[in-house]
Structure formats: structure tokens, C-alpha cells
């Protein structure tokens, strides 16, 4: 259990962990568990683990039930024409990139190495290439799925198309995905890296960020995250992620990032670099970003969104600082506050077929990926920290609404258990998802027996 990204999952004690090595073995397990629940109502609870990165307790585990760990599921690999790649849900994105980089190809995947394909592809993960191509789920050409009956089916644009659409953003509500086939596209090395700054420069970053996030049209090659880190003891620093994904040839220091590069850079510690800017491949960038993340620790994610506004970025920073000061001396404490632009071109997703529905239509968005971590020894602070974050987000949303800059959107891969992504989707989208769930899972096994993840609303 200590292999999960967040040690909150170690609080749960499954009765058994199964490690299937094929879709057929997953099928046997699901059929047995489904029959058991039919005979003993409320029993035979199970969790499904792909990469095990979702941090909240029970997302991919269960207490006194069964965990189906997909760690040993096989991957078919890249197709002969290099147009697709088929991998298991437990494959981490950096391994996918490593295969594709060798052929100057890529796909949409997470920006951080070590995260499994399954969760990010069935939800609404964001990529370095999302302004050009949309969300990770929109790259899935085919799902191999084990249904509650134990049947193994393919879901794609021509076969079980409604299930294909539902799984593109519908999370774990329809079956167990045992293989994911992703579209690949031409992509060579590109320019990017991290830049480090003192916290006193933050308002320069906020102004540049708001200008970039408000841009119409948005440069689809521009990827940027403004990251502010509150470290143990109360020291803040800034470590931004900048990528310009145009390749063949790559463009160093493109015009869109010139204002950002004028801000004074400062190493986090003496002897460290002030930036890591270079031309490199996506495998390298993802592993660099992952190296900044300590685990195993206890982690909490959350997400909040608003219109691009430099003043509100400062307001939220001050509110976050005030809310977390009481915890900064906890062993291992760290707050990572990521401001990320979500331009209209990304939200519209090139008209992709998925189950996200119409995402808010009020223009470009800035969303916050909130991540707090601390050592396992401080587990007694879980509830207090969660309550502090909930109070902070409620106050921030209230303030944003007063200013007319609230945006009804959260990024599902960054949401905590109290933030259901389905609350942010349209009524018609939810009705379609529920209908698909009842069609492929008439006994609602994945609603009743699999408590982890985000369940569909009852309508």
C-alpha cells in the first residue's frame, strides 16, 4: 500500500490484492465479484488501481475488500505505422513518451512522469499539447473494457461508440479499462524548462500570466504554469514551467514568452541553476517536473477556477498564505500553488466526442491546481487541513463571484473527494452518462461495489 502516490491510501486495509496479467483474468475476477454481490447484497466491494496517483483516500483502494491492481497488465506498444500506441492503464506516461520520442511522435499525456495512463485518460487530464489538441481523453482511439458481466469488449468510434464516448471523461463508472489505444502525432524536441524566482517577483508573473491567459487568439504552442511553493517553515519561492511545443525546428525564447524571461531569476538554493531552459523531448521534461515532487507523503489536491485577473491571483495567494501558516511547521509540509491557463481553444477541444459536455463558455480560464503534502506522522491533521482548504475555496469563490470573475469549472484530475467533477457538467451530459452506465452495467456494480473515484449523480 506504500506504493501509492499518497499515503492516505495506506490507511485502508484490503482483504486481498489481486494482480491480474490479462483481460481474461480481470474478467474472471469481476464476474466472481459481481456474482458475490448479487448473492450477498452490499458485500464484495472492490477497488481498481492503475497508476495509483489520485491522492484522496479510497480513490483506487478499499477497506476490507479486494483491490485489482493492474500493475502487470501487458502493453501491445506502438503500431507498425506509428499512428497509435496501445498500453496498459498502469503504464506511466513517461514510458509512453519514451517509446514515441524515439520516432519523433507523441500523444497527449500528463506533464509529470510516474502517473498512470488509466486515470488521466478516463478523466480530463491536461497535457503540454492541450492547447493544440484538447484533453488527454480526446486522444483515445479505443478502450479494451471488462464490463460488470465479465464480458471483454472494445469501445471506439465504430464499436460500442456510446461507451467509448462515456469513458472519455466518465472516469471509472462503466467498467475496468484493461488497455488504452492512443492516437499519436508528429512531435520532435521542443524548447522549455523551469525558471526560478524569489517570491517578491510574483506580481510580475501574475501580470504576464493574466495577459497570456486572456490572449485571443491564444498561441496554441504556448504551455505555462506559474508555480508558487510554500516550503516547510514558511519560505515561499517560485518555480515556473515554460514550454513552447513547436518543433522542426524548435523555437527558443519565442515572442509569447519574452515578457516572462525579463523577470529576474534566482536559484532556489545557492549552487543550483536559475533555470533549466533547453531544447529537449517530452520524456525529459516530464521526468524533470516529477523530480520536484516528494513522495510517499500524505497529499491533498483541490481545484478552483476564475477568469484571468492578476489582482485576484494576488488575492488568492494572500488568502492561501493566511490559511496555511498554521501548518507550515509540520514535518514535510509543502504547499504547491499552480496557476494554469485554460484558453478557449483548449476548452472547446476541436469539437471532440467525449463526455465532458459543453465546458463553461465565458471565455478563457485560469485554474488553480492546489497540492498540499506532509509526512505520514502528521495524519492527525488530515481533517483540519481539508477543512481549512474548503473554507479557503468557499471564501475565494464568493469573492470571485462578487468581482464577476468566477468560472464554473474544475480540472477533474486535480479535484479532491469533496469536489465532484460531475457537478460541473450539464444536465444533458449527466443524463447521457447515467443512461450509458445503466446500459452496460444494469446491476450498477461500478456504482455500488466500487466506491472509489467520482460516482455518477443519482437522477
Swiss-Prot record:
GO molecular function terms listed in the Swiss-Prot or TrEMBL record: FAD binding; oxidoreductase activity
Segments forming domain FAD-binding PCMH-type: 10-187
Null allele phenotype: Abolishes the production of cercosporin but accumulates the naphthoquinones called cercoquinone A and cercoquinone B. Leads to dark orange-red mycelia with significant export of colored compounds into the agar.
A matching Pfam family: FAD_binding_4
The keyword Flavoprotein belongs to this UniProt entry's keyword annotation: yes
UniProt EC number: 1.-.-.-
Enzyme class: oxidoreductase
Pathway assigned to this chain's UniProt record: Mycotoxin biosynthesis
Xref: SUPFAM superfamilies: FAD-binding/transporter-associated domain-like
Induction summary: Expression is positively regulated by the cercosporin cluster-specific transcription factor CTB8. Expression is also affected by nitrogen and carbon sources and pH, and is also controlled by another transcription activator, CRG1, previously shown to regulate cercosporin production and resistance.
Top-level taxonomic group: Eukaryota
Xref: Gene3D superfamilies: 3.30.465.10
Keywords carried by this UniProt record: FAD, Flavoprotein, Oxidoreductase
Function: FAD-dependent monooxygenase; part of the gene cluster that mediates the biosynthesis of cercosporin, a light-activated, non-host-selective toxin. The perylenequinone chromophore of cercosporin absorbs light energy to attain an electronically-activated triplet state and produces active oxygen species such as the hydroxyl radical, superoxide, hydrogen peroxide or singlet oxygen upon reaction with oxygen molecules. These reactive oxygen species cause damage to various cellular components including lipids, proteins and nucleic acids.
Family statement: Belongs to the oxygen-dependent FAD-linked oxidoreductase family.
Official protein name in the record: FAD-dependent monooxygenase CTB5
Gene: CTB5
